[in-house]
Each structure stands twice: as structure tokens, then as C-alpha cells.
From Swiss-Prot:
<feature type="binding site">
    <location>
        <position position="48"/>
    </location>
    <ligand>
        <name>Mg(2+) 1</name>
    </ligand>
</feature>
<feature type="binding site">
    <location>
        <position position="23"/>
    </location>
    <ligand>
        <name>Mg(2+) 1</name>
    </ligand>
</feature>
<keyword id="KW-0548">Nucleotidyltransferase</keyword>
<keyword id="KW-1277">Toxin-antitoxin system</keyword>
<keyword id="KW-0547">Nucleotide-binding</keyword>
<feature type="binding site">
    <location>
        <position position="23"/>
    </location>
    <ligand>
        <name>Mg(2+) 2</name>
    </ligand>
</feature>
<feature type="binding site">
    <location>
        <position position="25"/>
    </location>
    <ligand>
        <name>Mg(2+) 1</name>
    </ligand>
</feature>
<dbReference type="Pfam" id="PF18765">
    <property type="entry name" value="Polbeta"/>
</dbReference>
<keyword id="KW-0067">ATP-binding</keyword>
<dbReference type="InterPro" id="IPR043519">
    <property type="entry name" value="NT_sf"/>
</dbReference>
<keyword id="KW-0479">Metal-binding</keyword>
<feature type="short sequence motif" description="GSX(10)DXD motif">
    <location>
        <begin position="11"/>
        <end position="25"/>
    </location>
</feature>
<comment type="subunit">
    <text>Probably forms a complex with cognate toxin MJ1548.</text>
</comment>
<comment type="function">
    <text>Probable antitoxin component of a putative type VII toxin-antitoxin (TA) system. Neutralizes cognate toxic MJ1548 by di-AMPylation.</text>
</comment>
<protein>
    <recommendedName>
        <fullName>Putative protein adenylyltransferase MJ1547</fullName>
        <ecNumber>2.7.7.108</ecNumber>
    </recommendedName>
</protein>
<feature type="binding site">
    <location>
        <position position="25"/>
    </location>
    <ligand>
        <name>Mg(2+) 2</name>
    </ligand>
</feature>
<dbReference type="GO" id="GO:0016779">
    <property type="term" value="F:nucleotidyltransferase activity"/>
</dbReference>
């Protein structure tokens, strides 16, 4: 196990909101691709296993906020997550400002954009 910095449970099981249909989400922190594939081969389809460092930032933040440590030192993991929390703080406002209120709004703006693009480019 020393090839893995941390193993976290996240998602519905970590929040204690799981149902019969819920999968078990496991996140490997500080693991190389070969070790990941080795673990995946041993566990098969029992778990949904992801590499923390390869996930989108918003999912990383959800994991940081709502996880349970299966393996690893909580303090060391917290220190490891510091840089991701800092990046999120720096980007959160821009990310939130670029969200749409609804799918309808997104589609409407996309159509307006495409119409303008067509008008300009011909």
C-alpha cells in the first residue's frame, strides 16, 4: 500500500446518503497509473475508483469537503489538498460567474452566439 498516499471514500457512501443503486466511490491520492491499474485489476467492478489528481477541480473540491479516509494520514492529506483548495479559491468566482441558470438559458445564449458568428463570418 505504500505506493498510495491516501485512499478516500467519497460520494453517497461518505455522506451516508446511499441507496441500493448507489455505487461505492473510491479515490486514490498520490498514486501512479500502474499502481492504479493494478488495484483496479484486483477489485474489478466492485468500486468506482478514480485518481484524485486526474479529476476536474470541482470534483476534487467535493471530495476534499466530503470524504472519509480509508488509508493515509488525515493531516498529511489535508496538507496535500492545500494547493487544490488555493487554486479553487482563486478560480471559484470565475467558475460560478460562468454558470447558467438553466439549460434553456444556455441553449438561448448558444443560439444567439451562433447567429452572431454566422452574421460576422457569413
Amino acid at each position: 500500500m505504500s505506493k498510495v498516499f491516501g485512499i478516500l471514500l467519497y460520494g453517497s457512501y461518505a455522506k451516508n446518503e446511499y441507496t441500493k443503486r448507489s455505487d461505492i466511490d473510491i479515490c486514490l491520492v498520490g498514486v501512479d497509473r500502474n499502481t492504479y491499474l493494478e488495484i483496479l485489476g484486483k477489485l474489478g467492478n466492485k468500486y468506482d475508483i478514480k485518481i484524485f489528481e486526474e479529476l476536474p477541480l470541482y470534483i476534487k473540491m467535493e471530495i476534499i469537503k466530503n470524504h472519509k479516509v480509508i488509508f493515509g494520514d488525515e493531516l498529511e492529506l489535508s496538507e496535500h489538498f492545500y494547493k487544490f483548495r488555493k487554486i479553487w479559491r482563486d478560480m471559484e468566482k470565475r467558475i460560478r460567474e460562468n454558470q447558467f441558470n438553466s439549460v434553456r438559458e444556455k441553449v438561448m445564449l448558444r443560439r444567439r452566439f451562433n447567429a452572431k458568428k454566422e452574421e460576422i463570418l457569413g
